[in-house]
């Protein structure tokens, strides 16, 4: 069966991708998963310099999923280019680099460094709820989202996917904003902001107090938002949020997604 998908001019062997932050750069999972079977590997967020992330504890189990506040810990663009890209190039899968930053200039620096690298697509993360600056600050304001999309597009040599947050009043307006800024595709949803209390310690389960909720509990919300975004814009949509089964993925495709990303399910035994 031919399951190839054209995503912004890039051919994927199938529409199944990993979700950023749940698969590293693929090496950790390569002993358990044949990366050649994936449509694309979406890397963990990559910044201009190494980020330490948030203090621990930063992961907690919740009903129907998990709560995390990793804070986009990553080794930085230098090590990513030196180590991770050569590893991924050994496989017959597309490479999607998730880019994170605190400021527009930091995003641009990473995008510019990747311009001459053999990667296929860029996913710009303006939707992480677990960093104090950047990310979600762009992802909740349509004007800011449009402006950073336009700024990144000036430097990008690969197609640009803008990753949207569900923590907004209107996902349709956010989708329209990044499309107006020149986005080649849109991915959604990132995690929903949540909180858990450790009743035995009488304190927050996470050091960051709040974190991002992911897993099957958010799937119906994700399906609804993918549907709304797909009906608001004319660029391809990548659907994610609580996808565990083929049926979950098909739901996303039926409401307008061109491809899907699997995230929290990667953490299951």
Model-derived regions, located:
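N-terminal capping/small domains of soluble enzymes
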Residues: 1-95, 101
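Alpha/beta enzyme core
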Residues: 31, 102-238, 247-257, 262
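Short beta->alpha connector loops at strand-helix junctions that form conserved
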Residues: 44, 241, 263-264
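Acidic-and-aromatic substrate-binding clefts and catalytic sites of carbohydrate-active enzymes
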Residues: 24-25, 105, 268
């Amino acid at each position: 069966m031919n399951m190839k998908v054209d995503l912004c001019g890039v051919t994927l062997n199938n529409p199944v991708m990993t979700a950023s932050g749940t698969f590293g750069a693929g090496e950790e999972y390569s002993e358990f998963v044949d990366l050649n079977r994936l449509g694309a590997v979406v890397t963990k967020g990559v910044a201009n310099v190494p980020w330490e992330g948030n203090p621990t504890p930063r992961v907690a189990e919740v009903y129907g999923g998990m709560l995390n506040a990793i804070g986009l810990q990553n080794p930085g663009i230098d090590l990513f280019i030196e180590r991770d890209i050569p590893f991924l190039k050994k496989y017959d899968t597309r490479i999607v680099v998730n880019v994170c930053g605190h400021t527009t200039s930091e995003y641009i620096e990473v995008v510019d460094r990747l311009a001459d690298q053999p990667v296929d697509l860029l996913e710009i993360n303006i939707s992480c709820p677990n960093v104090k600056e950047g990310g979600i600050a762009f992802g909740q304001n349509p004007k800011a989202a449009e402006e950073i999309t336009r700024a990144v597009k000036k430097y990008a040599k690969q197609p640009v996917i803008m990753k949207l947050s569900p923590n907004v009043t209107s996902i349709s307006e956010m989708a329209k904003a990044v499309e107006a800024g020149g986005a080649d595709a849109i991915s959604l949803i990132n995690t929903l902001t949540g909180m858990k209390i450790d009743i035995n310690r009488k304190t927050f389960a996470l050091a960051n107090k709040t974190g991002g909720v992911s897993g099957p509990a958010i799937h119906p919300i994700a399906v609804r938002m993918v549907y709304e975004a797909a009906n608001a814009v004319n660029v391809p949509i990548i659907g994610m949020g609580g996808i565990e089964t083929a049926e979950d993925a098909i739901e996303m495709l039926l409401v307008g997604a061109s491809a899907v990303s699997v995230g929290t399910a990667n953490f299951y035994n």
